[in-house]
Structure formats: C-alpha cells, structure tokens
C-alpha cells in the first residue's frame, strides 16, 4: 500500500472514530443467529464504499467477528473477505469483473475441499435514515457521503442479515458461475427492501398529496354532494376539503425524528430502568420480505405513541404513520406529533361524508404506498388495565384498501405495551369513581411531565402476525371476487365484510393478550390484591410469586409472551424499590402491604396479566370448592365455562388446545405440591399448598361474581335484552358491594359490564354447547358458577330478585 493510500485510510479511520456511532441490527445478532465466528466468513455489501467497509470493520471487531479487511486464508491461499454487489454486472461475453473473479475463486476453493463451508454474511451500512422518493437515486458521491456522515454519523446502523451457507448454494445450483448473477439480483432486492424497511418511503409534499387526493373520483363526488347538501359554492366545498386534509395529514420530518430520538433516549435512560423488547425479529423479517406492516397495539398511556416509535427506530425499522385522536392536536404537541408521523382522526365520522371520504382516501394512500401504519384498535386508553372492546372502523378501512389494490401484502402486527408505572393511572381511578375526564391541553402536558420519575421498566412485545391475505383465504375463500379497480367511487362493502372485521378484531385482541409481559409490579399486585387484607409476609409473598412464575414458565409454552427470568427475591426487591408497597417491620417476618389508597391503582397493573392466570385460578377454585373432584369433572366444568371467559378475556386456546392446556396446568399444580392426586381425584395439599392455592383462586373471585350476576339474571329473565341486562347487572353489583362492604368502584363500573355484555351477546352462539339448547346451556353454566362462589352471595342475589319481584307485583296492583 502506498504512503498516499495509508494516509487516506488513516484519515478515514480517524473520521469514523470521531463522527460515526453505529448501532447493530439485530442487537444480539451473533448469539441469536448461532453464527460461529471462528468459521470462514465472507462479507457482501450493497455498494462500493470504503467508509462503509471501515464502519463494518469496527462493528465486526466489537462483535468478535473476523476483520473484513484481513484476507481469508484457506490452504495457504489468501482471498479478500468482502465483496460489493454493485461490482457484479452480467458480462454478456465480455471479460468478467474482479467481483466475479473473486467469487469464482471461492467456488474453486470448494471444488478442492468439499468439506469447507464458507459462511456468506450480507451486511448493509446505513448512515442517516432520511426517507427518499421511490424514484430517487440512493447512490451518492464521495463528497456527499462525507457531509452525510459528518451531519448524520451519530445516527448510523449496521444491518447483519441471516448468514448463508456457500456449500448449500453450490449443492443446490452446481458450480455454474451464472449463479453469481442470480445471487447478485437476489441480494440487490434484499438490500433494497432492507433499506425501505429501515428508512421508509417519503410521502409527497402536502401540496402534491392534496392535489392527488382532490383529483380522485371519490373525493370529487363527495365535493359535489357537499356543495349540493350544504348549498355552498364548489370553491367553498373545495376549501373545506383542503382544511380537512390539513387537519388529518401527517407532516413527517426526519430532523424532528432524529431530535426526538435524542430527547427520548435521554428520557428513557433517566426515568425508566430499562425498555424490554420481545419478538422484534419476526417483524423485521416480514418487513424485509416486502410486507406492508400495520402495527395494532393495545392502548395504556399517551406514552404508547412515543415508546413504540422509539423501539421501532432502534430495531432498525421505519417509524410508522400513527392514527392519533384529534384531542391530541393541541399546541404545541399537535405540531410535534404530526412531524413524528401522527395523522389525526376524529372520534366520530357520522354525518360528515366529506370527512370520511377524505380520511379513507388518505388511509388508502398510506396502505397502497407501502408505508408502515399504526392505530389503536381499542379506540382509547384503557382505564382499567383490561383490553377494551375493539373498535372496527379503521380495521374495516384496512381491508377495504386491500380490496381496491391487492398488490401490497398487508400484515397486522398485534403489539402488547406494558409498564410498571403508568403516569395517568391516578386520573384513570378518578374517572372510574365518576369524575369527568379532563381535556388534554398544554398545561396538562406540563403537569404530566412533572410525574416522570420512578417509572420502572417498559415492555414492548410483538405478538403473532396476521397476514391479511392468508386470513381471508382461510375465513372467506371467495374474497377475491370482491376486488375491484381502485378508481371506483363507492367504498367496497361486500356482504361478508362486517362479520369478518369483527372476527378479525377479536383475533387481534387475542394475539395482543397472548403477548403479555409479566413483571414485578403486576405479579406483586396480583398476589397482594388476592390476599386477605391486601397483606402478606415476605415468605408468603415470595412463595406466591414463585407459584405464578412456575405456572407461566412451565405450562403451557407461549413464545410471544415474556416472563422475567429473575428470581422471586429479585422481583420483590425491585417492586419494593418502586415505592408502591409498604413494608411493616414490626412483625416476626417483614409484612408487605398495599396501602388503602394504592388498592385501586394496583388493580390496573393486576388487570394487565389477569387473563394469563384465568385457567390456573379456575382449577384452584374448583378444587377448593369441591374438596375432592376428579380430573375429568374439572375439565368438564371448565370446558363449559371456557367460551364465556374466552369472549371477555380474549383467551388464546381453541377448544382442542384447551384440553392439553388444562392437563399441563393441573400437572404443574401437582408438581408445586399445591394439590394432590389421590385415586384420580384432586384434593388440596393441606401440608404445604393450602394458602398458595387460596390466593391463586382468590384472583378470579370478582370475575366469578360478575359472571354469576349476569347468568343468574339470564336464568330468571330468559328474554332480557342487552341494555336491560347491563342495567340490572350494575344495580345488583352495586347492591352486593354495599352488603359485602366492597369499596371498589370498578366492581360495578359501566365499562366492566358494557364491554362484557356486548361481547357476550355478539358471540352468544359460540357459548352454546352441542349437548344443550341456549337456555339450558346458560342454566348449566350458572349451576357451575354457583358451586364456585359463596352461598351467601347466591342468597343475596335470590333475595334481591325476590324483593324486586314483590315490588313490581305491588306496583302493578296499585297501578291497576
């Protein structure tokens, strides 16, 4: 190497050291991929760049991988360890390029030694992530590269793709050199998709986008209808449409995203003790394959918008366009959110055809353009910590967009977002007690920022993806008959759409719940809320935490949820550090208590994971209430109850999977010595498992009471409608709350019964057993529930019903 070259490389090394700070994608690539760093590794990169090569060298050495600038030595032969794909061009009879010659040398090595297995490692280096137009050339000259690295070098990523075995390629395609060209074509497509999945496409500027939308047939017709119905001029209708487009459309700014990355990075590090991400690689692979990704997260907090975008950015994925409620479009948050990708949606479209047409057209533009999109299927934030009944409007538009343009392969990604501390939880409990929701504004935002401390850990779990085309193929085999050209005016509303959207929304909710994150706060809250007087000694609480952890780790397996790998002692110490519990030391053992004022708040965190413990809690309750019961009878009773619980709690198991899950859970409770199996009958293990089993069972006490109220009323009023049933259920729950001295406003809150009853009535036919009529099935379910709740509660319900019946009889007589 000449002195001039040495000076150039040394200068480049120094520049990279000072100005480049790269992040590895995926974060734990070497361990997750199972790559053997001692094996011969050959790097391929998209395009010729010495700077990219040096950045790759720095990252490779950090990860313990071979230096790409050190030649590969095999049988005393030295060959360069890297190749640029853009150097491979089909020669068509001309002399082969140096890249082709290099690849042929690798083929020659294999022909001499067939046991040699060289690993091809595709790598792309990305400096900055400014979205580009699809027709824009990504190649830049050296000077442009220098200034890009100088300005954006701290925002660099090194993407390692899945390793490829050279021997497998040769065995599959022989040693024909033409395979080089095929590999180059495949690699170019892969690198381009990887680039798009990380950076995303740039939306047209507002003026061009609005012009395109206004020229569509659907909006032109809506403008004519607007002018005619409101008796205004076409120009006025046109101005109204522009105003609505400006209200809706996002205005993504890469510089704002880059700045927010710095601010959010500082905030997460200062106020959170860690952000845990699970199953992101599945999403990344789908994006690399060209899928149009739609993120469908649960909604716990306003922090969800920021957290998910931040996580995606750090996972090397393009930040999505986010459907945000119009209530967040206040100064200055609205403008910031808009630049971060938010587009704003009104709560209600009814009566405003122009708005709904424009919003649908804007959403179509996002879907057909392949932009990642995010919307909250619950519509609003959950005040109880439970998943809300899904809102299906935007989901329906997603399917309709695909029916207008089948080309994008849309995949829905359910996302579970969890926190150890939700900053709005205090206001949620106030709203449950009847206080009015405060309107979001600048001063409320400042007040919220003041609460940013001791936030614990955050969790983002990506659930099982749902590929729309595959889902429709399975559930609506003839759906392709409903596809029509994109320039048609009317929205596509095939006869199957409404029912399919409802079922799909329900499946999304199941997949969100199935990806739950288990942490110290929700586990400790679950145990203490289920205990007598909301207090346990330290050994008792540790025993209960261990029971929960073992149940979730051993039976049944779930690849989408995340269970902490910490020991119960570590979990408890962390939970106590969060200052949500009180430790009483004037006791033989430390006593951990929930202060009275914390009880409503802790219900929120308990509710986040309660669905994961429904089945083991049902088993525990059944064993405790029946004292001596066969495995078959436990399975029979829970199988009858399961459809009712599945509906509201969005439980994952099908009827076929349920039997296996129940057997695994029962075996686990035997292994933990909570129950004993005597002559094929289950009894409580009085010597060691009584208290653990009682607390486990107590976790669903309120749920069983809710269901008992509903099914009691369904047995005495067979023809009752949904609205009346909700009213009567709430009244009876309130009455029981007073008699049983239960202070929880959540027990009889309208949101509990409203969502539950809506889903029950929608899925009523799925509750019916093959052996029973609908009413007989309801009576059988109530008979099982009667055996699982206190006889005192049954007496109170019957007495309440008798008094009401007498009152109605008396009222009728006096009226007559």
Swiss-Prot record:
GO biological process: CDP-diacylglycerol biosynthetic process; fatty acid metabolic process
Motif position, HXXXXD motif: 298-303
Keywords: Acyltransferase, Cell membrane, Lipid biosynthesis, Lipid metabolism, Membrane, Phospholipid biosynthesis, Phospholipid metabolism, Transferase
SUPFAM superfamilies reported for this sequence: Glycerol-3-phosphate (1)-acyltransferase
Record bears the keyword Signal: no
EC code(s) of this entry: 2.3.1.15
InterPro entries: GPAT/DHAPAT, GPAT/DHAPAT_C, GPAT/DHAPAT_LPLAT, GPAT_PlsB, Plipid/glycerol_acylTrfase
Pathway per the UniProt entry: Phospholipid metabolism; CDP-diacylglycerol biosynthesis; CDP-diacylglycerol from sn-glycerol 3-phosphate: step 1/3
Highest taxon of source: Bacteria
Reactions accelerated catalytically: sn-glycerol 3-phosphate + an acyl-CoA = a 1-acyl-sn-glycero-3-phosphate + CoA
Subcellular location: Cell membrane
Cellular compartments per GO CC: plasma membrane
Stored HAMAP family: Glyc3P_acyltrans
Comment text on domains: The HXXXXD motif is essential for acyltransferase activity and may constitute the binding site for the phosphate moiety of the glycerol-3-phosphate.
Similarity remark: Belongs to the GPAT/DAPAT family.
NCBIfam families for this protein: plsB, PRK04974.1
Protein name: Glycerol-3-phosphate acyltransferase
Organism: Hamiltonella defensa subsp. Acyrthosiphon pisum (strain 5AT)
Lineage: Bacteria, Pseudomonadati, Pseudomonadota, Gammaproteobacteria, Enterobacterales
Name of the gene: plsB
């Amino acid at each position: 190497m000449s002195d001039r070259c040495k000076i150039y490389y040394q200068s480049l090394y120094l520049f990279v050291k000072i100005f480049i700070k790269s992040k590895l994608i995926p974060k734990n690539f070497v361990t997750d991929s199972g790559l053997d760093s001692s094996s011969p590794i050959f790097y391929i990169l998209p395009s010729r760049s010495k700077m990219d090569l040096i950045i790759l060298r720095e990252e490779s050495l950090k990860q313990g991988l071979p230096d790409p600038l050190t030649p590969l030595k095999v049988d005393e032969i030295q060959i360069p360890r890297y190749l640029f794909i853009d150097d491979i061009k089909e020669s068509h009879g001309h002399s082969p390029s140096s890249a082709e010659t290099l690849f042929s040398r690798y083929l020659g090595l294999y022909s001499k030694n067939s046991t040699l297995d060289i690993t091809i490692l595709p790598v792309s280096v990305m400096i900055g992530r400014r979205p580009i137009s699809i027709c824009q050339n990504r190649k830049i000259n050296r000077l442009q590269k220098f200034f890009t690295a100088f300005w954006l070098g701290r925002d660099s990523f090194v993407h390692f793709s899945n390793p490829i075995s050279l021997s497998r390629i040769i065995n599959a395609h022989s040693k024909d050199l033409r395979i080089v060209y095929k590999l180059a074509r495949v690699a170019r497509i892969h690198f381009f998709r990887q680039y798009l999945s990380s950076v995303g496409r740039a939306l047209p500027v507002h003026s061009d986008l609005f012009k395109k939308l206004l020229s569509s047939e659907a909006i032109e017709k809506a403008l004519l209808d607007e002018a005619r119905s409101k008796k205004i001029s076409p120009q006025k209708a046109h101005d109204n449409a522009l105003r609505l487009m400006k209200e809706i459309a996002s205005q993504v700014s890469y510089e704002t995203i880059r700045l927010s990355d710095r601010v959010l990075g500082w905030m997460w590090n200062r106020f959170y003790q860690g952000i845990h991400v699970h199953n992101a690689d599945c999403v990344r692979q789908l994006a690399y394959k060209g899928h149009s990704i739609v993120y469908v997260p649960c909604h716990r907090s306003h922090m969800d918008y920021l957290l998910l975008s931040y996580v995606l950015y750090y996972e090397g994925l393009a930040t999505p366009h986010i459907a945000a409620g119009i209530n967040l479009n206040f100064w200055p948050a609205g403008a910031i959110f808009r630049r971060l990708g938010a587009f704003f949606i009104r709560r209600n479209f009814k009566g405003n055809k122009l708005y709904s047409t424009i919003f649908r057209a804007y959403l179509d533009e996002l879907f057909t353009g392949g932009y990642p999109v995010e919307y909250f299927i619950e519509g609003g934030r959950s005040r109880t910590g439970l998943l809300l009944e899904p809102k299906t409007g935007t989901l329906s538009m997603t399917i309709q967009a695909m029916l207008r343009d089948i080309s994008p392969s849309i995949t829905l990604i359910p996302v579970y977002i969890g926190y150890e501390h939700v900053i709005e939880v205090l206001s949620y409990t106030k709203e449950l007690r009847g206080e009015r929701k405060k309107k979001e504004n600048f001063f409320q935002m400042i007040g919220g920022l003041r609460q940013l401390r001791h936030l614990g850990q955050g969790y983002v779990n990506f659930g099982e993806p749902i590929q729309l085309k595959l889902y429709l193929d399975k559930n609506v085999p003839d759906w392709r008959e409903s596809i029509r050209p994109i320039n048609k005016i009317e929205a596509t509303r095939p006869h199957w759409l409404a029912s399919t959207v409802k079922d799909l929304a329900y499946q999304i909710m199941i997949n969100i719940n199935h990806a739950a994150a288990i942490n110290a706060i929700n586990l400790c809250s679950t145990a203490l809320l289920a205990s007598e007087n909301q207090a346990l000694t330290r050994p008792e609480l540790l025993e209960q935490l261990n029971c929960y952890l073992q149940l979730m780790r051993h039976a049944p397996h779930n690849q989408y949820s995340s269970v902490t790998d910490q020991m119960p002692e570590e979990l408890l110490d962390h939970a106590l550090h969060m200052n949500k519990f009180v430790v009483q030391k004037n006791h033989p053992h430390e006593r951990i208590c929930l202060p009275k004022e914390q009880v409503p708040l802790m219900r929120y965190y308990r509710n986040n994971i309660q669905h994961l413990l429904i089945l083991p809690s049902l088993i525990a309750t059944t064993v405790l209430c029946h004292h001596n019961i066969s495995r078959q009878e436990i399975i029979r009773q829970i199988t009858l109850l399961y459809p009712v619980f599945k509906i509201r709690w969005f439980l994952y198991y099908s009827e076929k999977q349920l039997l296996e899950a129940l057997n695994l859970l029962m075996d686990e409770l035997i292994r933990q010595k909570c129950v004993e199996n005597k002559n094929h009958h289950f009894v409580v293990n009085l010597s060691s498992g009584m208290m653990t089993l009682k607390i486990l069972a107590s976790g669903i006490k309120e749920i069983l009471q809710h269901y008992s109220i509903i099914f009691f009323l369904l047995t005495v009023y067979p023809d009752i409608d949904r609205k009346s049933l909700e009213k009567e259920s709430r009244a009876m729950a309130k009455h029981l709350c007073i008699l049983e001295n239960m202070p929880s406003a959540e027990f009889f809150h309208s949101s509990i019964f409203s969502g539950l009853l809506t889903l029950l009535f929608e899925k009523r036919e799925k509750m019916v057993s093959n052996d029973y009529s609908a009413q007989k099935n309801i009576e059988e379910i109530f008979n099982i529930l009667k055996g699982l709740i206190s006889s005192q509660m049954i007496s109170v319900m019957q007495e309440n019903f008798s008094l009401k019946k007498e009152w109605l009889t008396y009222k009728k007589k006096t009226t007559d």
